[in-house]
């Protein structure tokens, strides 16, 4: 019977795979808030006038800042941390330490409180998706 590797090589390969899995687990444990912020922006950009991750304010493992302009033309700087999202200023690329706005668990909750137009656009998009699913299931 031919083998591609000896049993000793197989043992060494298994050990390196375990080490690799452990390293992947360690790396996955560390969050990059910039990536989280980009995902938030991509998720709801369709429902606001403008939204982007700040290039002026610092991003780190534990914090990122997102600039949001609602359809009503309200401008906000939003802080994203493990605690959630909260408005930290009423203009782009700013922070105001005197503001004590509450954290929201999701971007949907935050935008729901800031923008009635967001609520309408998001609700309409959801309705269209549900109607499309219904049509697909009937055909």
From Swiss-Prot:
GO molecular-function terms, A-Z: kinase regulator activity; protein kinase A binding
Lineage: Eukaryota, Metazoa, Chordata, Craniata, Vertebrata
Segments traversing the membrane: none
Localization, UniProt: Cytoplasm
Gene3D superfamilies with a match to the protein in the record: Hypothetical protein (hspc210)
Protein's GO biological process: regulation of canonical Wnt signaling pathway; regulation of Wnt signaling pathway
Pfam families attached to this UniProt entry: GSKIP_dom
SUPFAM superfamilies: Hypothetical protein c14orf129, hspc210
GO cellular component: cytoplasm
Protein name in UniProt: GSK3-beta interaction protein
Region named Disordered: 1-23
Alphabetical UniProt keywords: Cytoplasm
Family from the record: Belongs to the GSKIP family.
Originating organism: Gallus gallus
Superkingdom as given in the UniProt entry: Eukaryota
């Amino acid at each position: 019977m031919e083998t591609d590797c000896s049993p000793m090589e197989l043992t060494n390969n298994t050990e390196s795979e375990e080490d690799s899995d452990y390293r992947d687990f360690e790396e996955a444990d560390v969050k990059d808030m910039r990536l989280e912020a980009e995902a938030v922006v991509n998720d709801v950009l369709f429902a606001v006038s403008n939204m982007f991750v700040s290039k002026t304010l610092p991003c780190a493992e534990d914090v990122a800042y997102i600039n949001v302009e609602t359809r009503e033309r309200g401008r906000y700087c939003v802080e994203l941390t493990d605690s959630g999202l909260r408005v930290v200023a009423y203009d782009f690329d700013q922070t105001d330490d005197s503001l004590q706005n509450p954290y929201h668990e999701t971007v949907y909750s935050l935008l729901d409180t800031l923008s009635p137009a967001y609520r309408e656009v998001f609700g309409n998009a959801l309705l269209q998706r549900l109607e499309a699913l219904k049509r697909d299931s009937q055909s």
